[in-house]
Amino acid sequence: MKKAALLNSDISSVIARLGHTDSLVIGDAGLPIPETTTRIDLALTHNVPTFLQVVNVVTSEMQVEAAILAEEMIEKNPAVHDALLDQLKRLEQHQGNSIALHYVSHEEFKTQSGKSRAIIRSGECSPYANVILCAGVTF
């Protein structure tokens, strides 16, 4: 049995196969997922697991150099937005690098998310609780 925080074999496999600048999406329960994109569905019920719980566990194993968010999140979901920024700041300190933040419209976010290696669906039921994490390198 794995000893690290991330036990989900599908997510572990996707992270292990990421190359520099490849992306992985963590989304809320309502984010549309194209048929052509790998879906990893973790949603059990409303808010289980939460978006932030999934971000925390995924980033414990993924090297992140950039994050893309929908600009609507700032106004429509400020509590989750601020908590996500706090998590990314802690991740920067842990990784020893800067994580670039990019904001796009929700429509552009949905377009870009379809180009990711996978979309992880959380049980989060708050608006715009989505992030595209772009893989960095550990050297």
From Swiss-Prot:
Cross-referenced Gene3D superfamilies: RbsD-like domain
GO cellular component: cytosol
Catalytic activity: beta-D-ribopyranose = beta-D-ribofuranose
Keyword Cytoplasm listed: yes
Entry EC no(s): 5.4.99.62
Keyword tRNA processing: no
Subcellular compartments: Cytoplasm
Domain of life: Bacteria
Active site: H20 (proton donor)
HAMAP family assigned to the protein according to its UniProt record, in alphabetical order: D_rib_pyranase
Stated role: Catalyzes the interconversion of beta-pyran and beta-furan forms of D-ribose.
PANTHER family named among the record's database cross-references: D-RIBOSE PYRANASE (PTHR37831:SF1)
The protein's name in its UniProt record: D-ribose pyranase
Species: Pectobacterium atrosepticum (strain SCRI 1043 / ATCC BAA-672)
